[in-house]
């Protein structure tokens, strides 16, 4: 399933934008665990209260943190536009998302205009069906584009991340994640579906809110699908493939030198501390065969060093050379990392 959408939104509301309805804290979803402070004037008063939507679908899986409710309430909200309507299908219909989330927040006892919320985090996301499962692309992304394998969160076992505390790209096997969550029982979903998330994080909001004109949720609601796609592609190019492009095309010369390292790493894994001697031997055999042919090399080896060899000995030499050639081919001529990176880039830069 190919798709483009906003998969996470974090908003903050200042005190003058938050109005608490009477008895709000008795609405479903508010945690009974509340943080309090003490003062001589006020006694014990709440300083932080947390909210978790009791159902996921139809509520955006909303979580909220309400601070300083007694004196000057401040509100932070996080929700997933996808789950306003569906368990996993991405959406860019932020006007409908606005209506759903405005209602959910109101039913939690808080009266705010969601359009006034200041953007703190936005995840612009694409799902693409690749030619292989997403796991197979991870080594190339990790080796050549400096993506890092993500191991601290189970949902990203089959993926990797790239970026900093301001902007990140997260790539993972979407099919594996949904299957793990039990969401594919009654759904048709291609097993090669991969997800790439462009995460605009809170520490970089002073920069990206200006760059992409996403200051408030109203800016998100009024943005078009083309704008979201432009933001996503900008992240793909400038975070994921920075210094690896010439214009809109991959710069082969910026990636190709890494192919030699990848090949040598394959030999090191296969042969341990003797990998380099084996690598040189195999490369030499392949080079001689390409220059003279296998039969000519067998004849030459049979004639040198011990006189003429029997047909049996020649067959043994030929078999040994063939084994070396086949192993070299397997270790060096599988699908290249460059090919994986090229498909990754071409697929995710496409408009949906």
Please provide the spans of the model-predicted regions.
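Helix-turn-helix DNA-binding segment
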Residues: 309-319
């Amino acid at each position: 399933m190919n798709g483009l959408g906003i998969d996470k939104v974090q908003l903050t509301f200042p005190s003058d934008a938050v109005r608490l309805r009477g008895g709000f804290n008795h609405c479903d979803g508010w945690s009974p665990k509340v943080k309090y402070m003490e003062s001589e004037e006020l006694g014990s008063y709440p300083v932080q209260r947390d909210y978790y939507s009791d159902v996921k679908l139809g509520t955006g899986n909303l979580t909220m943190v309400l601070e300083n409710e007694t004196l000057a309430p401040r509100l932070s909200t996080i929700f997933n536009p996808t789950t306003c309507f569906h368990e996993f299908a991405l959406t860019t219909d932020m006007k409908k998302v606005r209506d759903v989330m405005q209602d959910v927040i109101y039913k939690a006892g808080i009266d705010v205009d969601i359009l006034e919320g200041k953007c703190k985090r936005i995840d612009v996301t694409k799902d693409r069906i690749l030619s292989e499962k997403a796991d197979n692309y991870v080594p190339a992304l990790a080796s050549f584009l400096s993506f890092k394998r993500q191991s601290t969160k189970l949902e990203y076992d089959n993926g990797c991340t790239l970026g900093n505390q301001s902007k990140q790209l997260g790539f993972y096997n979407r099919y594996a994640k949904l299957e793990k969550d039990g969401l594919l029982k009654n759904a048709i979903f291609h097993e090669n579906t991969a997800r790439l998330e462009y995460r605009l994080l809170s520490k970089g909001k002073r920069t990206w809110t200006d760059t992409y004109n996403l200051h408030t949720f109203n800016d998100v609601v009024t943005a078009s699908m083309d704008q979201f796609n432009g933001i996503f592609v900008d992240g793909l190019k400038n975070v994921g493939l920075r210094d690896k492009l010439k214009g809109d095309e991959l710069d082969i010369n910026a990636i190709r030198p890494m192919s030699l390292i990848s090949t040598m790493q394959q030999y090191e894994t296969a042969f341990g501390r003797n990998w380099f001697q084996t690598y040189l031997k195999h490369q030499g055999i392949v080079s001689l065969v390409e220059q003279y042919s296998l039969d000519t090399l067998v004849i030459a080896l049979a004639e040198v060093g011990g006189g003429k060899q029997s047909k049996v000995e020649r067959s043994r030499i030929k078999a040994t050379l063939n084994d070396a050639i086949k192993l070299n081919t397997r270790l060096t001529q599988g699908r290249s990392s460059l090919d994986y990176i090229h498909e990754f880039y071409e697929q995710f830069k496409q408009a949906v």
